[in-house]
């Protein structure tokens, strides 16, 4: 298949040096490929500043000052627990971590979203169905519950771009995917010594 001078072979793009695909052409292809349905609206195709930077072609010049400023903006925008309490109920957190529903066109937006954490991480060691796109989080409580550790973990859940700008991890708090209570419960699932995450097989 050919698209504006690019040869697409089984997902591999071989682009001739003399050809480029204009960004407006890409936007037009994307816009024509999606149809708004229920909560899955066309607004999802609009990239924010971080997504634009992280979608730049490999090898494109990157301004480190811009990257640093974007990371700082994300860090400054993190909202910590309103009552200062980071940990909720690990049992509820286990349910959130194992629930993959939410934000799809077929999902009821009135029902709470799940975190779908197992799609990318190993958590409880006896769970065999987990992804490995992200690091294993088994034994996470070994890191302790110091204030810096609690704040770090909360920030990663709220908006991972505050630490890793081009991370694929969902921005659970910043995007309103999970509620504050759900985030507290996931925190407990990770950090409570009684949680299955922190038990040996």
Predicted segments, located by residue:
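Extracytoplasmic electron-transfer domains, predominantly the class I c-type cytochrome c fold
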Residues: 25, 31, 35-41, 45, ...
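Post-cleavage N-terminal segment of exported redox proteins
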Residues: 14-103, 156, 189-201
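Bacterial N-terminal signal peptides that target proteins for export
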Residues: 1-8
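Generic anion/oxyanion-binding catalytic loop in active/binding sites
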Residues: 81-82, 106, 172-175
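Local sequence-structure signature of Cys/Sec-based thiol-disulfide redox active-site neighborhoods
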Residues: 106-115
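Secretory-pathway/luminal and periplasmic proteins that interact with or process carbohydrate-rich
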Residues: 103-106, 126-130, 196
